[in-house]
């Protein structure tokens, strides 16, 4: 799926505001993901056996959260370019062995959209939920085609 220049600008702008406090945003994303999908926590080696409340301050959790958010940053940087397909293939290859499939990417997208919406609401910034939802549908489909 291709996104308009305005949509790309919107998601990148929202992303930049989130990265101002990336640790807090990352913890919120995973808190939402695991509250909604408790069984997903076992798919993350760094989070296994941790209470969701214990993610903050855990160096293994922090490291993995930054890896996940870094991957999303790569996707946003590659929107509407051929590089995006390369990233999708890599993510599919990295996640399939752990049973992380298209649905899990959709669910992660929902957690990210909710967290970003909260962050934008607190900062008074605009948030185009429909564009973000379309983006994560596209991401899940893009990765899913290689699984």
Curated annotation (Swiss-Prot):
Coiled-coil zones: none
GO molecular function terms listed in the Swiss-Prot or TrEMBL record: heme binding; metal ion binding; oxygen binding; oxygen carrier activity
Residue span, Globin domain: 2-147
UniProt binding sites for heme b: 64, 95
UniProt cross-references to Pfam families, sorted A to Z: Globin
Keyword Transport: yes
Similarity field: Belongs to the globin family.
The protein's name: Globin
Organism name: Aequiyoldia eightsii (Antarctic yoldia)
